[in-house]
Amino acid sequence: MFADKLHPFLDRYDEISTLLSDPNIANDIEKMTKLSKEQSSIEPVATAATKYLQILNDIEENKALLEDAELGELAKEELKSLEISREKLEEEIKILLLPKDPNDDKNIFLEIRAGTGGDEAALFAGDLFNAYIRYAELRGYKFEIVSQSEGNTGGFKEIIVLIKGKGAYSRLKFEGGTHRVQRVPETESQGRVHTSAVTVAIMPEVEDSEIEINPNDIRVDVMRSSGHGGQSVNTTDSAVRITHIPTGLVVTNQDGKSQHKNKEAAMKVLKARLYEMQEQERLAKETSERKSQVGTGDRSGRIRTYNYPQNRISDHRINLTLYRLDAIMAAGLFDEIIEPLITHYQAEAMLEAGI
């Protein structure tokens, strides 16, 4: 019975509440912090479980009244309402019981790179960047550009943005992968549709304690900053390139006002990339074991197609097609795709967990 799965959470919540009121525990800051954190993580389930068990109790009470001459009809109507509430709350609890992604509440580094398609790919990278920024603004997230390399005719060859806001990773983690665009470039005189692509990486911002880099494993090169067209923008060598020797990862930053700022920003991106690399290795291992349909950042996988002539946007992981590409891109309405992706992931996770 579903209710049986809830009692351990309620028992543990009550146990923690008792422990937190113990004067001996109150004097142990480390233990107090650990218990408070556990209580916060259990509280949503405990609160919902209490409501659920009360609904079950109300259902039984109303069932007992069905044969009553005066209250039978009223009990029948009440049972209908209670059953609807029970089903809705049960689904909510199932989602709460799913293992929480430890990165979900983190800020993210959004990296967009032009792929096949040359200048047109760079232009689309710019369009996608603008759409994501509109999405970030809709959700109340803050953002700052970490580094950028502009395309020859506009857009970006590469741009990295730090997006700050609670739950940023949980909303955008499914955006990682290859985004294909089909449209007629402005420079196309014959009206032919060209296909190009950009790759998107979503990397959680990591704390210094989460990933350590041996100073001997990196090489830091200082260069002259360059602006549009490659011209020098100052007289100091402030641009920084950091190479992580064991992996070959290279991060360059020149957007800060000083060498120190550029090095600090480059190190943050490097840590995020190394963390992402570790996550990809872990996910690859898990995926090989359970063949998950929805990836959470595989750069190699083609996840979405943007077809401008048809005003169509298709997400290939869940076979979702919407004919409102113009509105989604113009207003950053990515939740129209993200919500179905989250629902799909949750259903898949419930199936695996046997919930």
Curated annotation (Swiss-Prot):
Provide an example Pfam family for this protein: RF-1
Q: What is this protein called?
A: Peptide chain release factor 1
Q: Which UniProt keywords apply?
A: Cytoplasm, Methylation, Protein biosynthesis
Q: Where is this region: Disordered?
A: 283-306
Subcellular location per the Swiss-Prot or TrEMBL entry: Cytoplasm
Q: Which PROSITE patterns match?
A: RF_PROK_I
Q: Which residues carry this modification: N5-methylglutamine?
A: 231
State the post-translational modifications. Answer: Methylated by PrmC. Methylation increases the termination efficiency of RF1.
Asked whether the keyword Cytoplasm is assigned, the reply is: yes
Fetch the InterPro entries from UniProt.
PCRF, Pep_chain_release_fac_I, Pep_chain_release_fac_I_sf, Prokaryotic/Mito_RF, RF-1
- Bias (Basic and acidic residues): 283-292
User: What Gene Ontology cellular-component terms does the record carry?
Assistant: cytoplasm
Q: Which GO terms describe its molecular function?
A: translation release factor activity, codon specific
Q: Which family does the record claim for this protein?
A: Belongs to the prokaryotic/mitochondrial release factor family.
